[in-house]
């Protein structure tokens, strides 16, 4: 353990040897010179007297994450480092060092300035004393005007004025000196700026006027008598009682707040004064005044100015009585205008009175609100520090730097472990040997002590072996911090000796830096909650008016929220305004004319990109859209179920129906089939060849689609189905021969969707061929149900089939149909089937979505015009 301590000491010394005895910790001068040559930074060690405490400084690692490390408190060669003042942003040091007595000096200066300029508490007693002195001087100056009290009052006035001059002079000097606590009054220029204030100029004028009066005294010469009149200038000292001009500010604010009302009252009063004075002057100007003997004297209203004087005294309710109207006309005019003018002349007094009362109340409330500033500022500061001490925010280091600069810990110097465990060191043993040659490549390094170079104190008794908990805790904290510092500094240099530096694991009890951060975090949380509680206490209402205002504000906020909620509800459940874009208007020459009741949203020939912009974005519109989609899905499912039912019915048909002996059935069986209304409908069925080669594995790609006719599934049927009429003969002629038979899977599926067209334009006898049966009720219900679906086979072209995502759509060209009243083709030629790879629902324009155009669904066209096509699919 001692070897590791000596190695750490040698590394800290910058090349010191590992020798034992008294020179184990001494630095090598040569090694120190070589290290100093490549390093220009300062070296930090421990100065005498700083051995008991160290400050927590910013980590020296490259990450600069605010790690708390130990740093010595002094310079090299025992020089104490002078703390530099840091600017507000903790970036630029102040140029002047801060003196030790500056804090006390500034505190006294601020205290005097507040007592003189902003008196509170005990300072009010001094200002009350000054007021009594000024009032006494004023009373004695008044008594000197009496002949009987002139001598006595003059003597007392001289003594009191002399005392007042000294008091006011000292106060003025203290004001000039204490003004330096304010930033704008610093220095001699700031003092001159403070002396140029109006109240300071008034103090200077009163002092200058009082000095000659006191110097002359009570002499009876002419000079003394003339100077005594300056004593009444002391009346101006009453103005200095309000140093901050609060009364004048209050009056000015009241006048400014009610300026419009005051101007209105004064304007109407002035008009009343002019009009009443002029009318009284016209009536009374030629009436002479009579004395007691009845002799005529000059007129009382000789000029218009006399009338204005009378009007002002009368309307102001003073009424000296020196001028009065003599005639009844003048008295009537004076009475009429007095009733009007007096009210307007007295109105400004009421306005100012109410305004002053409101301002005083507002000032009291403002003082109450000012009490919230400090708790609010403390809460903001505590909230920020609580946020900044979050361990997950590694980018916030300012708060940790603050704690690094203010938090300090007791320091126990590092020594040989044997000596630390065997005895308690004295004061001299805790003094670090200065090491002027010690250096390190990083410059800023901790230099541990070595007790081998210090003589052991003989006054200390040996202690039992072992460290107590307090020493172990402090030693572990210092050793861990030093080891982390060393590792962070030597990480970039790649020093091979870095692994040997540090201390034994026996003393590394725990990592103190995270523990310290956690403790600071806990303190910040407690302070945040405390300041939050204090701030809530200051939010209590000041008076009933505050309570009413709070309720009013809450009521307005509630109304605004209710209005916002109502707006949201209206937007959710109210459909949007109808929109009619330009591209949805009917064009001339178009194939179809859309009805007016049809929604543009359901127009089949409008692209999705166009309809999405005009869709109703309200919740009700979305509900309607979902409901329509569910309805469309139901129709599609009905269509698929119908297809499946047809397929299953086709497989259940008896095979013997297709042989010639089928017609030789018994009459009883024929009648039974006629009566059976639930027999399956005769459908188109593909027949597999029995004479051909064995069926190969089926694949959709084995049989090209161009080789299969529209009715190719009858190519291998040995039976030629015949029907009555010329159309059946023509249909049989068009059927391909069964000479070349080959095994293939049927490529078409029957559909009952279009059977309604067959029923409409064929008679019952035409539908019932030699191999046909009655239509079952279930099929009839399927026909009735599917006839309402907006599925159309006339509008799907092959381009739509190619871009269909599923490849399963109803395929039939609209050009293949021949519209006419007589479509005498056989029902065998009608293409009531689905081709493989086709569907009716994949293309966007023909997806069932509500009401479709009549031209698209065929509702407005007669059933007799539907004629199938002969073209292959």
Swiss-Prot record:
Residues 1-41, 575-603, 723-742, 766-873 are annotated as: Disordered. Keywords: Cell membrane, Ion channel, Ion transport, Membrane, Phosphoprotein, Potassium, Potassium channel, Potassium transport, Transmembrane, Transmembrane helix, Transport, Ubl conjugation, Voltage-gated channel. Pore-forming subunit of the voltage-gated potassium (Kv) M-channel which is responsible for the M-current, a key controller of neuronal excitability. M-channel is composed of pore-forming subunits KCNQ2 and KCNQ3 assembled as heterotetramers. The native M-current has a slowly activating and deactivating potassium conductance which plays a critical role in determining the subthreshold electrical excitability of neurons as well as the responsiveness to synaptic inputs. Heterotetramer with KCNQ2; forms heterotetrameric native M-channel responsible for the M-current. Interacts with calmodulin; the interaction is calcium-independent, constitutive and participates in the proper assembly of a functional M-channel. Heteromultimer with KCNQ5. May associate with KCNE2. Interacts with IQCJ-SCHIP1. Interacts (via the pore module) with SLC5A3/SMIT1; forms a coregulatory complex that alters ion selectivity, voltage dependence and gating kinetics of the channel. A motif (Selectivity filter) lies at residues 317-322. The modification Phosphothreonine is found at residue 82. InterPro entries: Ankyrin-G_BS (IPR020969), Ion_trans_dom (IPR005821), K_chnl_volt-dep_KCNQ (IPR003937), K_chnl_volt-dep_KCNQ3 (IPR003948), K_chnl_volt-dep_KCNQ_C (IPR013821). It comes from the Eukaryota. This is Potassium voltage-gated channel subfamily KQT member 3. A 1,2-diacyl-sn-glycero-3-phospho-(1D-myo-inositol-4,5-bisphosphate) binds at residues 244, 260, 367. One of its GO terms (cellular component) is voltage-gated potassium channel complex. Residues 11-26 have a biased composition (Gly residues). Belongs to the potassium channel family. KQT (TC 1.A.1.15) subfamily. Kv7.3/KCNQ3 sub-subfamily. KCNQ2/KCNQ3 are ubiquitinated by NEDD4L. Ubiquitination leads to protein degradation. Degradation induced by NEDD4L is inhibited by USP36. It is a multi-pass membrane protein. Expressed in dorsal root ganglion (DRG) neurons. It catalyses: K(+)(in) = K(+)(out); Rb(+)(in) = Rb(+)(out); Cs(+)(in) = Cs(+)(out); Na(+)(in) = Na(+)(out). The gene is Kcnq3. Residues 588-601, 725-741, 844-873 have a biased composition (Polar residues). One of its GO terms (molecular function) is voltage-gated potassium channel activity. Each subunit contains six transmembrane segments (S1-S6) with S1-S4 forming one voltage sensing domain (VSD) and S5-S6 contributing to form one quarter of an interlocking pore-forming domain (PD). The S4-S5 linker preferentially interacts with PIP2 in the open-state KCNQ2 channel, whereas the S2-S3 loop interacts with PIP2 in the closed state.
